[in-house]
C-alpha cells in the first residue's frame, strides 16, 4: 500500500527543510561544546537544558512518568526530580564531544571488564549516567564489539553521530533486520554485542512495567537462549565529586529454555 500523500509531504519537508535547519543549529553548538573544557561544557549545557526544557511539552511527559514510578512523592519532590533529570540530560549532551578525553584523563572508573575479555557475550545497557560510555566498553576490554543503534530522527545529525563514533573500535548495526544478522554473526564468531534495553518501542513482548503493560525488547534474551551466551548488564553511574563516572558489568546471567519455563542463573 503506497504511503499517504500527507506522509510523503512530511517526509520531504523533514529531509529538505526541518532536518537541515536543526542541523544548522546543532552543529555550531556541538563545535562550541567541543572547544570548551569538559567540566564547563557539561555544566553550561546542563544549565541550558535546565532552563529551557521545562518550557516544552516534554516536561509534562517527564512528570507523568515520574509520578508512575514514585506515586508517594509530593508534587514538590516530583518537580525537583524533573529539574534534575533535565540538568543531567544537558550534562550528557555537553559531554558528548569529550568522551574520549574523559576516558583518557581517568574520569571513568571501570569494574568487571575482565569478564568479557574472552568468549561471546551480550551487553545490555540503559540511558543512565552518560550512556555514550556504553559504546566504549568493548574497546576498554580490548575487544571489537558490535552495537545496535536507533537512528536519530534527523538524517544529517545521524551521519554525524556515526562519524563521531568511528574511533570507538566497534561495528554499528542499524536497528532492524541488519542488526539481527550482524549480532548473530558476531556471537557465532565468539565476539560481543551490545544494545540498550530501555528505548521506546512499538514492538516486542508486553511486560508489566510499574503496573503498565509495556512493549519490551526481547532480542538479548532470544539470542542468549539460542546460542547459550551470557548476558551482562552494564551500568554507568555519575558522581558529583572525585571520580566523574563509574562503569561496571554485572555478574553474568544465563538463560536456559525448557518446554515450559525459562530458567535464569547468575555466576
State the predicted function of each range.
Residues 2, 72, 76, 80-83, ...:
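Non-catalytic C-terminal accessory region of glycerolipid acyltransferases
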Residues 2-125, 130, 159-162, 169, ...:
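Membrane-anchoring hydrophobic helices of lipid-metabolizing enzymes
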Residues 60-61, 150-155, 214-217:
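Active-site metal-coordination segments of metallo-dependent hydrolases
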Residues 42, 76, 147, 173-174, ...:
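A generic structural-conservation signal
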Residues 62, 134, 160-161, 182, ...:
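Residues within well-ordered alpha-helices
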Residues 31-35, 130-135, 181-194:
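Short, composition-biased local secondary-structure segments
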Residues 120-177, 202-205, 238:
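Catalytic core of membrane glycerolipid acyltransferases/transacylases, capturing the structured
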Amino acid at each position: 500500500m503506497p504511503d499517504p500523500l500527507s506522509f510523503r509531504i512530511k517526509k520531504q519537508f523533514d529531509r529538505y527543510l526541518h532536518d537541515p535547519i536543526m542541523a544548522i543549529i546543532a552543529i555550531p553548538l556541538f563545535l562550541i561544546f567541543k572547544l570548551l573544557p569538559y567540566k564547563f561544557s557539561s555544566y553550561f549545557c546542563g544549565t541550558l537544558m535546565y532552563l529551557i526544557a521545562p518550557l516544552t511539552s516534554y516536561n509534562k511527559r517527564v512528570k507523568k512518568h515520574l509520578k508512575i514510578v514514585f506515586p508517594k512523592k509530593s508534587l514538590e519532590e516530583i518537580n525537583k526530580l524533573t529539574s534534575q533529570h533535565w540538568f543531567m540530560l544537558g550534562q550528557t549532551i555537553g559531554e558528548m564531544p569529550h568522551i574520549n578525553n574523559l576516558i583518557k584523563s581517568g574520569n571513568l572508573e571501570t569494574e568487571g571488564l575482565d569478564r568479557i575479555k574472552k568468549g561471546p557475550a551480550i551487553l545490555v545497557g540503559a540511558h543512565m549516567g552518560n550512556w555514550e560510555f556504553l559504546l566504549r566498553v568493548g574497546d576498554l576490554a580490548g575487544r571489537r564489539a558490535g552495537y545496535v543503534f536507533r537512528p536519530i530522527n534527523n538524517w544529517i545529525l545521524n551521519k554525524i553521530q556515526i562519524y563521531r563514533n568511528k574511533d570507538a573500535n566497534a561495528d554499528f548495526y542499524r536497528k532492524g533486520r541488519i542488526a539481527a544478522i550482524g549480532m548473530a554473526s558476531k556471537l557465532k564468531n565468539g565476539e560481543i554485542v551490545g544494545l540498550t534495553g530501555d528505548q521506546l518501542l512499538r514492538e516486542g513482548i508486553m511486560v508489566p512495567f510499574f503496573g503498565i503493560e509495556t512493549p519490551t525488547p526481547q532480542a538479548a534474551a532470544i539470542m542468549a537462549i539460542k546460542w547459550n551466551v551470557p548476558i551482562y548488564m552494564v551500568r554507568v553511574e555519575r558522581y558529583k565529586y572525585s571520580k566523574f563516572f563509574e562503569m561496571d558489568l554485572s555478574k553474568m546471567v544465563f538463560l536456559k529454555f525448557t518446554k515450559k519455563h525459562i530458567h535464569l542463573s547468575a555466576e
